[in-house]
Structure formats: structure tokens, C-alpha cells
Amino acid sequence: MFRLDGKIALVTGASGGIGAAIARTLHGQGATVILSGTRQAVLDSVAAQIAPDGARAHVCPADLSDPAAADALVAAAEAAAGAPLDILVNNAGLTRDGLAIRMKDEDWNRVMEVDLAAPFRLCRAALKGMLRRRAGRIVSIASIVGITGNAGQANYSAAKAGMIGMSKSLAQEAGARGVTVNVVAPGFVQTAMTDVLAEAQREKLLAGIPLGRMGQPDDIAAAVAYLVSNEAGWITGTTLNVNGGMAMP
Amino acid sequence: MSEIADKVKKIVVEHLGVEESKVTPEASFIDDLGADSLDTVELVMAFEEAFSVEIPEDAAEKIATVKDAIDYIEKQKAA
């Protein structure tokens, strides 16, 4: 079950903790993975860890804050793999936290651009081929805060909520062609993004998690691997909450 | 039949998987050739690519038949 042999998968933000785990898991299931991100050296080292022999792992750096780069990435990934894309995982994202009354327009705009507009552009580019081929899987990594909100993250939670709404629309547009579009909404996962939290903040968060631990990147990767598999072919437009029970929307 | 008409017909046959004899000038993509709304958008995109033209949204909405497509593209190419 859940094998991905012969599938071509593009994972954005593959230099980060969750993205690297997703790439590793999809590769382990047999997929050819294209790792994208802004940091070429980190991507190269993740690729080398995933596939020491270099098989079925390619690196395509891209700065998704540039609209043209997002459009070009799908083409570059297909060129690197030498085959059309079967799977798109929109994982790249960033935060610019701050209370709303002090949030600058540029912090709002940058998060909207990278966390919402870029995934849209990647979906648009990937869907063209997927619709024609009548097959494809798109999974976008949102966040629990896109559902619950979070003080200090008006921009990030708006972008992630936007990603959920966008995916439902795309799921309706692409459904007639057998293409599924879903979302994974991680809770509190141990990555560089959450390492910056203060100890008191961390303890408070942990108290709200029924399963009593922080998530690991592999917890998220497993959910993605399921949604992109052939077996998940009747699931579309959904958001899979992977959060240890922290929120049960 | 013009070169453009031939090429349009070929794209329609290929994309909608219909028999060539059914692709008459009067044939409506949706009513006669079984296209859904997504097919019509994809057809317009295929025309744009094949003929290196840009078909804006308001023009695309008016392209309902094979002849509509041929006429529009011929007009663009003549301009």
C-alpha cells in the first residue's frame, strides 16, 4: 500500500525540517523527488542524505518570492526529472510574526506572497499538465493557525486559511480530471521555526496537546505520503489535521 | 479549408477524443462534442499555444463552436 514507484514529486521548502522529511518519505516510497528551496547547499546535502547514490533525487533551487520563479519551477522540475509532474507538495513558507497593531505592510505582503501567492502559482502551473494527463496529486502544507488563528500571526494565519480555501476551489475545478487537491495542517512540530519559542511558551503549548508531545517532521510526512498515494484517490478538498489533538475542528 | 481551420480541427479531435467527421464548423464544443467547461478552457489554452495568440477571457467566452475558434484565430493572425 501507498507505494509511489514511478511517480515524480516536487517538494518546495525541502531544505526545512518538514520539507526534508516529506522528500525523504516520498523517495522512500519509490518516488523520484525534486527538492526545491532557496538554499542550494542545504538542498544538496538533504538530497545526498536521501539518495547517497543520487538516484531519483534532484535539486531545483528557486526563490518563490519572485513570481516568475514560481512559474518556472514546475518546468525546471520536469526537465530535471525528465518526466511530467505527478505530485506537487507546497511546503515552502515563512513567518513574519508580530501583533497586528505593529505589523508592517511589508511583513503582511511578504507572507502573503510566499505562503499563498507562490503556492497558487505552483498549483496553476502544475495543474495544466495534470488536467491534460488526467492524473495528479497536490498537497499543500498549511497550519493549525489557519483554522484556529494565533495572536501575533495575523499574516501567517490568513495565508494558511487562504491556502485551505484555495485548495477547496482547486479540488472542485480539478476533480473531473481525477486530480486531487488536499491540505495537511500541522500543529506544533519541532523545527527551526518552532525552536525559537521560549520555554514557557513551549510548556503552555504542550499542555494543550492530548497526545502529550510535539510533532516530528515524520508525523507530517506520513500524512502527505498517504494523501499523494493512489489509495487516497477518493479524498479531495480536505484538510488533514496532524496536531496531536491540539485542535479538533 | 484553410491551414488554420485544419489545425483547429486537429486540436479539437485530439483534445476531446471525438471523431473527425463530427468536428464540423457549426459543431458546438459543449452541445455537440461533449466538452465540459474545463475542456473549453483547455481548448482555448491549446489554441493559444498552437497559434501563438492570446485569447482574452471575454473573447474566449464567445468561442462556442469550431467556426468561432477558426474565425477568431484567423482575425488575430490577419491583424
Swiss-Prot record, chain B:
Query: Where is this gene product found?
Result: Cytoplasm
Membrane-spanning intervals of the chain: none
Record-linked Pfam families: PP-binding
A GO cellular component annotation here is: cytosol
Superkingdom of source: Bacteria
Q: Which residues form the Carrier domain?
A: 2-77
Any idea which residues bear O-(pantetheine 4'-phosphoryl)serine here?
A: S37
Q: Which GO terms describe its biological process?
A: lipid A biosynthetic process
Its post-translational modification remark reads: 4'-phosphopantetheine is transferred from CoA to a specific serine of apo-ACP by AcpS. This modification is essential for activity because fatty acids are bound in thioester linkage to the sulfhydryl of the prosthetic group.
Key words of the record: Cytoplasm, Fatty acid biosynthesis, Fatty acid metabolism, Lipid biosynthesis, Lipid metabolism, Phosphopantetheine, Phosphoprotein
Q: Which PROSITE patterns match?
A: CARRIER, PHOSPHOPANTETHEINE
Q: In which pathway does it act?
A: Lipid metabolism; fatty acid biosynthesis
- Listed GO molecular functions? acyl binding; acyl carrier activity
The record's listing under NCBIfam families reads: acyl_carrier, PRK00982.1-2, PRK00982.1-3, PRK00982.1-4, PRK00982.1-5
Describe the family membership recorded for this protein in Swiss-Prot or TrEMBL.
Belongs to the acyl carrier protein (ACP) family.
In UniProt terms, what function does this protein have? Carrier of the growing fatty acid chain in fatty acid biosynthesis.
Q: What is this protein called?
A: Acyl carrier protein
